[in-house]
């Protein structure tokens, strides 16, 4: 089944009905490997002769990767300009981005000098958090790797509402709704150091939109500096296969309600020489089947790796 897709911009509802949920986070391992130096920012002064047609959607049966789990997958292969999607209904449904939003907050903070990756340590308040790795002074790279919510809560507050809204509008990031800035809708957690609009609150995005945003950040038409992209690549690097020249970059995210995970993500991009794939894998909870961001990550890596083999 092939159909054309029309992309919509952000809307700003003053208030929307959302399920209230708590938050958990996934953590990413980072191999010590050299980062690709292929720039993606369009040279200054270059213009497009005409607008490109909207990419088509091709529906795929990737059920074997999910093994009965409730999930969706989106791959956008830049060279053939098609979205390959498993479970289209779920892939077009918006959910909380949770810790995948650390890609966006890192992007904005790095681009605007709010975070300097070489001088990025923030002091721990002394409060004991559930994740032991957060109970100390922590720098940007470690905060990204461990999904340290208190660190990013501070960074996002320094970015501020006005700049955050402008950036999300420019990226067309889901519903772009930051109205619940402090995350008060999140009744599962009253600690405001660990809540925010991006954690089971007002901000929502679909798996397809996640892949689209990755292309806007790391694609040829990116409006972000190569230096910022390079810093993000360093913390997002998840797996590198020297034999196939495949590098996979991504970030986990997980949100919970009443102690049980309800949203699990892994999103990012993969690179092979001059080619690039933007992807997202999402898992949603169903009765009797646990989900995790680690499982979403495992599925994404396997799916992307197998897709590349078929080139």
What do these predicted regions represent?
Residues 10-62, 94, 157-160, 211-311:
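Structured C-terminal helix/loop/strand segments within mature extracytoplasmic catalytic/sensor domains
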Residues 54-88, 267-270:
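A short, well-structured edge-of-sheet supersecondary motif
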Residues 89-96, 127-142, 150-158, 194-202, ...:
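Second-shell loop/turn segments in exported
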Residues 110-127, 225-229:
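Short, well-structured active-site flanking segments
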Residues 132, 139-140, 156-214:
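Mid-domain, small-residue-enriched loop/turn segments at the edges of structured enzyme/sensor domains
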